[in-house]
């Protein structure tokens, strides 16, 4: 049996990332995949990138990781770019978009927001037709098969549902979670790289972390307009939709 931890949307929140990595380690899980948005919103994207590179076997690109490399006049984005530096920006620019593998006889596809784009936002309350497109392949995918299990991130909203015998789930967010102010991640349980049907499980984990430390980090970092971010990590509610 293989266990794979899926973390995502860290957004430069190091106390949250540390708490999640500690929980994963305590469970004896050695394989970690990151589904993007390492940076942005929170103060320490630089440390988040370095930690993810150290601890994660696979990393895919999120919307923040994608647009942060583009030239901009936005002072907030410039602050994050400066903080990251050219080597980390290059690393983010080169990340792949999709992870695909067999597990317990199921074809699993993981991506940040949709199989088509890091900028397509799909919510659990969208209509079934739209949700079903998350199982589809796209030119970004390495394989044309329809996924049996599709997992994504982006919306900071952990959920799990079955659609016509297929399984859709969202990891939620490590560093900027909604619903409740606790870090969220997912564990996949199954037989990796096996085409034979076998037990398969998706587990959702919530990890409390020192929120006031994240607040302190934001205040001490000199990041522009930390107020919204601080309210978000304290309450688990978006203050402005700049995500």
Regions found by a protein language model. Give the residues of each.
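Active-site environment of divalent metal-dependent phosphoester hydrolases
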Residues: 11-16, 40-42, 64-70, 116-118, ...
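Active-site-proximal beta-strand elements of phosphoester/diester hydrolases
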Residues: 3-11, 107-114, 168-172
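Metallo-beta-lactamase
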Residues: 31, 125-133, 165-167, 171-177
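Acidic, His/Gly-rich catalytic cores of divalent-metal-dependent hydrolytic chemistry
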Residues: 162-243
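His/acidic metal-ligating clusters that form di-metal
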Residues: 28, 87-160
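Short amphipathic alpha-helical segments
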Residues: 18-19, 45-47, 122-123, 162-165, ...
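Core catalytic region of metal-dependent phosphoesterases/phosphodiesterases
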Residues: 2-93
